[in-house]
């Protein structure tokens, strides 16, 4: 009959290290994370349009002056709205003196 001893696990040679360490960098790639950030409600007040009116006291087709508070004139000669000669205005740009309307 033979006698067989079970194998004894290998033991390190020399003293047992107090800590295991290595010089290889440890890099681990993790999965991407998805984060949904919902903004809080913000109240924005936009200014409304500014409505202003400029009343004009003109009457179309009347014999009163077309300009309120002033008299239209061509080189000092008054122009009435009750029909006037256009040559008075056009001659001003041609270098001629205005003739009375």
Swiss-Prot record:
Keyword match Acetylation: yes
Record family assignment: Belongs to the avian keratin family.
Keyword tags: Acetylation, Keratin
Descriptive protein name: Feather keratin Cos1-1/Cos1-3/Cos2-1
Subunit structure as annotated in this protein's UniProt entry: The avian keratins (F-ker, S-ker, C-ker and B-ker) are a complex mixture of very similar polypeptides.
GO MF, any single term: structural constituent of cytoskeleton
InterPro entries named in the record: Keratin
Domain of life (superkingdom): Eukaryota
Chain positions found as N-acetylserine: 2
One Pfam family linked to the record: Keratin
GO cellular component labels: intermediate filament
Organism, as annotated: Columba livia
């Amino acid at each position: 009959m033979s006698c067989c001893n079970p194998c004894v696990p290998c033991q390190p040679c020399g003293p047992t290290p107090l800590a295991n360490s290595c010089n290889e960098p440890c890099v681990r790639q993790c999965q991407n994370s998805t984060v949904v950030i919902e903004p809080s409600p913000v109240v924005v007040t936009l200014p409304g349009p500014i409505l202003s009116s400029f009343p004009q006291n003109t009457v179309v087709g009347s014999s009163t002056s077309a300009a309120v508070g002033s008299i239209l004139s061509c080189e000092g000669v008054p122009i009435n709205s009750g029909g006037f000669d256009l040559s008075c205005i056009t001659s001003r740009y041609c270098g001629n003196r205005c003739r009375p309307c």
